[in-house]
């Protein structure tokens, strides 16, 4: 598959390399500190901090369709027992046929287009964005006072609050119209129970569009 730095997460689209796994991070932090000397030997040191971190990681998602990852074990020569089939797959990897050894974006768009033509606009393949946003605040204040040559006092207070928001959004429908907010793994085990496959029981069979939240959405408060 070319050099030893093989990366299965990209493929060609419109003559350009497109990566399915893209990580973006934005992490601004503000810190304020105030020192007050009331008198000799007495110091009050107070500080506050605010941090707001945005983190996202994209990935392919699919439902009722072949695994689009080129390094999926069923696409490797070692998966097949038939020697002729093994040789054919070895040749594809050896010659680095990028339509096979890399993500085939054209096939993903085509699968969604065929679904639309069949009267179903739901995405077979899509690109999701996994978000992990963090809000963190802290406050502390420390008093140091010398009462005498042999007696010092140190006292302090501190507080901290953290909220982590975890959710997924639809980054790119790859030509589809929407994605159904259902659990594809639960659908395999409980196909006869429509309630068990829903990600949101309050909104069953919900259609989610680009930039919409789906799958999971919860906060961690510390």
Model-derived regions, located:
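Outer-membrane beta-barrel transmembrane strands
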Residues: 14-59, 122-160, 165-166, 208-222
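Small-side-chain secondary-structure face that scaffolds active or pore-lining regions
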Residues: 70-82, 86, 164-183
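Glycine- and small hydrophobic-enriched segments that form the cores of compact globular domains
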Residues: 167-222
């Amino acid at each position: 598959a070319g050099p030893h730095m093989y990366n299965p997460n990209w493929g060609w689209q419109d003559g350009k390399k497109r990566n399915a796994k893209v990580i973006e991070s934005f992490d601004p932090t503000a810190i304020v500190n105030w020192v007050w000397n009331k008198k000799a030997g007495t110091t009050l040191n107070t500080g506050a901090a605010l941090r707001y971190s945005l983190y996202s990681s994209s990935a392919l998602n699919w439902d009722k369709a072949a695994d689009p990852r080129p390094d999926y074990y069923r696409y490797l020569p070692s998966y097949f027992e038939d020697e002729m089939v093994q040789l054919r797959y070895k040749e594809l990897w050896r010659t680095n046929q990028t339509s096979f050894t890399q993500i085939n974006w054209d096939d993903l768009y085509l699968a969604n287009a065929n679904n639309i033509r069949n009267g179903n606009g739901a995405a077979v393949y899509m690109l999701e964005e996994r978000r992990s946003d963090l809000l963190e605040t802290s406050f502390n204040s420390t008093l140091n006072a010398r009462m005498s040559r042999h007696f010092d006092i140190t006292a302090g207070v501190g507080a901290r609050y953290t909220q982590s928001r975890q959710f997924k959004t639809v980054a790119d429908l790859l030509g589809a119209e929407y994605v159904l907010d259902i659990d594809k793994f639960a659908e395999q085990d409980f196909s006869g129970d429509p309630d068990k496959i829903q990600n949101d029981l309050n909104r069953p069979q919900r259609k989610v569009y680009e930039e919409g939240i789906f799958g999971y959405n919860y906060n961690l408060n510390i």
